[in-house]
């Protein structure tokens, strides 16, 4: 009988040790990086206009200089997207392809800046802007969340984007869906607030992202690579791993909001198609 209880106790102890090790490993994977109050302050309680203050009827196109001007004048923060043209210019544009916004069947990275300049956004007189042109329009009036789009020249995009940011005196942070892009800033730009964009597993493109990778991305299991200081998660259900990361200190950023109630429980909100208050905390 004593041997039975001894074996049971040993088995329970082994189970506890294994469970503790597994729990520690999981926490290691999802733990965020630390950030300072100064880094967080411009974005805390801030409503950021998604791709600028563009309009539903497209009379003010997304990611246009006019959309960014309107957002800055209203006092909102700004979210925007950067990627490279064929000739290595950092341009502000969301999609990989030009079909939806410009009506041209081509990829952004297949055209030079001069070729992109000939296109119009949503049939208006607005053109695809350079990142530097957007910063010239904003003039340090808005906190900017800069998303780096995943592509074939990520290192070049990171280097050129950071070079531009380094010459700007306004408040900017970066984010990306690709943890390796976020990790580049972890090791090369420690002064810059960085965030991991994520969404539920089912939202990733099954044609380009495998199921295991989509699961890991959706549960922010690559945080150990980038140690993001905020998690920008699609508004809706957030898995336990994301909530634990937030509990451990990651700023809570939600996208894309279409109603003011999404401010609840978040530190920063990325919104579109309505005009919320500028600051909510």
Language-model segments: residues:
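Phosphate-group recognition and catalysis centered on beta-loop-alpha active-site segments
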Residues: 2-281
């Amino acid at each position: 009988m004593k041997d039975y209880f001894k074996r049971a106790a040993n088995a329970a102890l082994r189970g506890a040790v294994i469970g503790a090790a597994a729990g520690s490993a999981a926490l290691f994977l999802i733990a965020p990086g630390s950030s300072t109050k100064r880094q967080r302050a411009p974005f805390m309680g801030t409503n950021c206009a998604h791709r600028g203050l563009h309009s539903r009827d497209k009379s003010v196109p997304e990611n246009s200089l006019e959309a960014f001007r309107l957002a800055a004048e209203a006092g909102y923060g700004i979210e925007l997207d950067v990627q490279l043209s064929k000739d290595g210019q950092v341009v502000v544009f969301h999609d990989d392809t030009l079909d939806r916004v410009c009506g041209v069947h081509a990829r952004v990275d297949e055209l030079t800046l001069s070729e992109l300049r000939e296109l119009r956004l949503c049939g208006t007189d607005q053109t695809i802007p350079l990142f530097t042109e957007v910063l010239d329009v904003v003039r340090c009036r808005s906190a900017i969340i800069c998303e780096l789009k995943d592509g074939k020249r990520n290192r070049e995009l990171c280097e050129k984007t950071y070079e531009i940011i380094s010459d700007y005196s306004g408040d900017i942070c970066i984010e990306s869906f690709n943890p390796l892009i976020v990790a580049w800033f972890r090791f090369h730009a420690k002064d810059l607030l960085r965030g991991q964009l994520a969404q539920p597993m089912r939202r990733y493109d099954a044609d380009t992202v495998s199921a295991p990778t989509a699961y890991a991305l959706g549960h922010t299991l690559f945080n150990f690579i980038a140690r993001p200081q905020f998690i920008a998660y699609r508004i809706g259900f957030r898995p336990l791993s994301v909530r634990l990361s937030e509990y451990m200190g990651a700023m809570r950023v939600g996208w894309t909001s279409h109603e003011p109630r999404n401010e609840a429980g978040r530190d920063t909100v990325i919104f579109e198609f309505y005009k919320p208050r500028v600051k909510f905390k």
